[in-house]
């Protein structure tokens, strides 16, 4: 109360009944609706008084039940509509507050949406059937996340569906498969879609698997993590095991293995083959939903420890990725199939007796008609079995998305110095004795001799120390080299036919355009010679071999692919970067020396013709005419023919080499144009001159016998090679073909390639390389 209104201050007077003061607390607590009622009561009282004293009309009062108010209420009661043109609500768009409805099972994604990829089609239940069924027994569609299905190409959608049907046992009594697509077709993206779908969905409205292990080469672990982040936009985290202490690794793996929750924070483990082998005891204790083995041809030997460790995993879903499931023989192929689906082909002995022996006899060029018929019968039987669990697409699919690719096998003549050193080595008594000791199986001595000859075919610099020391095979060769010969810190390209040709071609490429070049070799010593040549000609270059760290490799690749970079050459060790590396900054590639395993060369040569390439590509494979390099090329052709028969189901693959041809590694004819062409017994050529072109349906994936054959520089698709043939005078023969069905015409030296207009725009794929290893481990004897 105000002090001025207190009785002591008012002199005992009462407060006026008309004062307007209201205690603040009472005013605060008084509800607004009560105030309105009070004011309304006073107003009505005033109106009644006025009516009694005057003839004023009463005001019109509107009530809520008038027609106008009802119309307004009806408008306001309309259902909310999203103010977006052509908006289609999802399944939850009709949900409202109120009484809880009965739970209805629905697929995670709309199976009727545009580009929807439905992996499992649920039964079409009627309303009556749904009412009579238990909610837990209703099956739903399994639909790939639109985030992924909208970017998958047609062949990738087919691959995801195939793998899903295999791991779910819908294609037979098995749960494993082999994804055998060739390089560049997106095997990684297909696996990301499969894993993401299985982790989130099933026909029973719950995850199919709770965790997955992906095993890959150590250099690809980080790449897998990048792929998941790239395609899923960070929606899922992976546990990538790379480096770290043993204690931290054990703790992380135990936590991953023991966690059986269906909603893990890191449901995917990325681990290398080596790390998995070390910690297999931890990972094999508990069940795993699925295992994926990248570069699965590493499991070609069923007796090694890594294979045995992976077989110990408690999982029935196994996916193996390999663009080259047959690299050397059918025994390796059996190991891969047996890993994903044990007992599908029986035991190793059963497979050898029932399939391998018969098929190999029929593959021989001197086999009888009966043996060939028997081989064909067994081949069809094997294909029928494995077709249930293997999917194979060639990179011919890429012709729809990439520019044309020209591939050339160039036979370069040895220089007089190389020729004399090669002949002296083969005539050496010590070499003859060592070769006589190894009739059927390779010995360490024979392998060393083969490596020596391979290096000699590349450049005498690679064996100069052996020549100077007069080692086996070079006892009388010290005087063959020039007097002023200095192999250290200097290179003379004129001493090697292949280096001489390379020198001319690099100069022509540099002078006639802005093309970049990749140089690949199996030996780091050869990369040293590339580096000396680049410094001598003042070419900008970068180099990648097994000594470079993984982090630095990525920076080097990005620098080379930058169009503004001054790097002209990329020098690459085939074993260090032959897998997964993306070098689309270059469109010309030289494979300087062949590998025993055709898969290694194929992987290395696929570095430039990949997603993102916008220029026509030229692949040059250099071999020394008539030398051991041509013998290696013939073995590659034989192995690829076997793969074509079994994997690609190519029944028309001709048999061109006998076993004796393949064993005859050390024969040498210095005057031959091409030992490979002679052994092909080509029916389209007369005296090494092509009289008929290859069939129209062939390309660079076909057998060498179905390529273009050139004994001169007329008709070549590349003006750079045509000019170098004339200038270097060291080319004896060329096989060439293209990737697309386009007419090949000779290109004048003043013109650019006709294919330069092809500029498709596709995804850029990050990649990582493998470790360096230049051993001839794939040589399997004579």
Curated annotation (Swiss-Prot):
Bias category Acidic residues: which stretches? 773-782
Every copy of the Helicase C-terminal domain together lies at: 501-658
EC number(s) on file:
3.6.4.-
Q: Where is the composition biased (Polar residues)?
A: 1-20, 741-753
**One record GO biological process:** double-strand break repair via synthesis-dependent strand annealing
| Region ranges (Disordered) | 1-28, 741-782
Q: Which SUPFAM superfamilies match?
A: P-loop containing nucleoside triphosphate hydrolases
Q: Which GO terms describe its molecular function?
A: ATP binding; ATP hydrolysis activity; ATP-dependent chromatin remodeler activity; DNA binding; DNA translocase activity; helicase activity
Q: Which UniProt keywords apply?
A: ATP-binding, Cell cycle, Cell division, DNA damage, DNA repair, DNA-binding, Helicase, Hydrolase, Meiosis, Mitosis, Nucleotide-binding, Nucleus, Phosphoprotein
Q: Where is this region: Required for chromatin remodeling, strand pairing activities and coupling of ATPase activity?
A: 2-9
Q: Which GO terms describe its cellular component?
A: nucleus
Provide the Helicase ATP-binding domain boundaries: 168-343
Which of the residues bear the PTM Phosphothreonine?
Answer: 22
Report the Gene3D superfamilies cross-referenced here: P-loop containing nucleotide triphosphate hydrolases, SWI2/SNF2 ATPases, N-terminal domain, Tandem AAA-ATPase domain
Question: Where is ATP annotated to bind?
Answer: 181-188
How does this protein assemble?
Interacts (via N-terminus) with spn-A/Rad51.
Q: Which family does it belong to?
A: Belongs to the SNF2/RAD54 helicase family.
The entry's function note states: Involved in mitotic DNA repair and meiotic recombination. Functions in the recombinational DNA repair pathway. Essential for interhomolog gene conversion (GC), but may have a less important role in intersister GC than spn-A/Rad51. In the presence of DNA, spn-A/Rad51 enhances the ATPase activity of okr/Rad54.
What is this protein identified as?
DNA repair and recombination protein RAD54-like
Q: Which organism is it from?
A: Drosophila persimilis
Q: What is the lineage of its organism?
A: Eukaryota, Metazoa, Ecdysozoa, Arthropoda, Hexapoda
């Amino acid at each position: 109360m105000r002090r001025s209104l207190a009785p002591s201050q008012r002199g005992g007077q009462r407060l006026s009944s008309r004062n307007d003061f209201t205690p603040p607390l009472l005013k605060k607590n008084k509800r607004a609706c009560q105030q309105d009622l009070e004011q309304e009561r006073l107003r009505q009282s005033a109106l009644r008084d006025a009516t009694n004293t005057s003839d004023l009309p009463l005001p019109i009062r509107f009530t809520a039940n008038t027609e106008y108010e009802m119309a307004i209420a009806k408008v306001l009661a309309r259902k909310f509509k999203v103010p977006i043109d052509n908006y289609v609500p999802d399944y939850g768009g009709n949900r409202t507050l109120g009484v809880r409805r009965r739970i209805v099972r629905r697929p995670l994604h709309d199976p009727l949406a545009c580009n929807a990829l439905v992996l499992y089609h649920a039964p079409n239940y009627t309303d009556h059937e749904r009412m009579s069924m238990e909610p837990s027994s209703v099956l739903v569609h399994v639909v790939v996340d639109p985030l992924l299905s909208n970017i998958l190409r047609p062949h990738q959608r087919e691959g995801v569906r195939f793998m899903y049907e295999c791991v779910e046992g819908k294609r037979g009594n098995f749960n494993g498969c082999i994804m055998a697509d060739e390089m560049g077709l997106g095997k990684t993206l297909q696996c990301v879609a499969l894993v993401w779908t299985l982790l989130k969905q099933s026909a029973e409205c719950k995850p199919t698997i709770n965790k997955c292990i992906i095993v890959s080469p150590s250099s690809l672990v980080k790449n897998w993590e990048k792929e998941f982040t790239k395609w899923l936009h960070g929606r899922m985290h992976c546990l990538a095991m790379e480096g770290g202490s043993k204690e931290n690794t054990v703790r992380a793996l135990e936590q991953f293995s023991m966690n059986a929750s269906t909603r893990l924070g890191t449901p995917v483990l990325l681990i290398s083959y080596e790390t998995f082998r070390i910690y297999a005891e931890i990972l094999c204790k508990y069940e795993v939903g699925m295992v994926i083995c990248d570069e699965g041809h590493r499991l070609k030997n069923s007796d090694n420890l890594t294979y045995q460790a992976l077989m110990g995993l408690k999982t029935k879903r196994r996916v193996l990725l390999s663009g080259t499931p047959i690299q050397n023989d059918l025994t390796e192929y059996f190991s891969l199939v047996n890993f994903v689906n044990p007992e599908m082909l029986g035991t190793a002995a059963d497979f050898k007796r029932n399939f391998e022996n018969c098929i190999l006899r029929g593959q021989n060029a001197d086999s009888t008609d009966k043996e060939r018929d028997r081989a064909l019968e067994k081949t069809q039987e094997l294909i029928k079995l494995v077709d249930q669990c293997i999917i194979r697409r060639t990179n011919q699919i890429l012709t729809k998305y990439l520019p044309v690719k020209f591939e050339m096998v160039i036979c370069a003549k040895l220089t007089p110095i190389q020729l004399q050193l090669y002949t002296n080595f083969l005539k050496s008594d010590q070499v003859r004795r060592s070769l006589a000791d190894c009739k059927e199986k390779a010995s360490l001595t024979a392998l060393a001799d083969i490596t020596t000859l391979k290096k000699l075919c590349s450049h005498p610099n690679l064996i100069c120390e052996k020549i100077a020391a007069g080692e086996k095979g070079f006892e009388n060769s010290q005087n063959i080299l020039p007097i002023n010969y200095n192999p250290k810190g200097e290179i003379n390209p004129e001493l090697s036919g292949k280096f001489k040709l390379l020198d001319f071609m690099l100069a022509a490429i540099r002078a006639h355009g802005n093309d970049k070049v990749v140089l690949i070799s199996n030996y780091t010593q050869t990369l040293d010679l590339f580096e000396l040549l680049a410094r001598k000609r003042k070419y900008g270059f970068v180099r990648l071999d097994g000594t470079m760290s993984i982090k630095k490799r990525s920076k080097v690749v990005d620098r080379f692919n930058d169009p503004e970079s001054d790097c002209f050459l990329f020098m690459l060790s085939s074993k260090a970067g032959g897998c997964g590396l993306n070098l689309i900054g270059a469109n010309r590639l030289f494979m300087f020396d062949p590998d025993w395993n055709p898969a290694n060369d194929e992987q290395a040569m696929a570095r430039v013709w990949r997603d993102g390439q916008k220029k026509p590509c030229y692949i040059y494979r250099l071999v020394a005419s008539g030398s051991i390099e041509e013998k290696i090329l013939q073995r590659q052709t034989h192995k690829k023919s076997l793969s074509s028969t079994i994997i690609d189901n190519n029944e028309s693959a001709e048999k061109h080499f006998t076993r004796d041809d393949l064993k005859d590694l050390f024969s040498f004819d210095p005057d031959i144009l091409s030992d490979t062409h002679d052994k092909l017994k080509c029916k389209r050529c007369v005296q090494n001159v092509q009289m008929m072109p290859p069939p129209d349906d062939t390309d660079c994936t076909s057998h060498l016998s179905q390529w273009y054959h050139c004994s001169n520089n007329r008709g070549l698709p590349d003006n750079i090679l045509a000019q170098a043939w004339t200038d270097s005078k060291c080319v004896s023969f060329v096989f060439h073909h293209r990737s697309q069905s386009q007419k090949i015409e000779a290109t004048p030296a003043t013109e650019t390639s006709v294919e330069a207009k092809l500029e498709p725009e596709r995804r850029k794929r990050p990649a990582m390389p493998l470790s360096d290893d230049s051993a001839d481990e794939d040589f399997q004897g004579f």
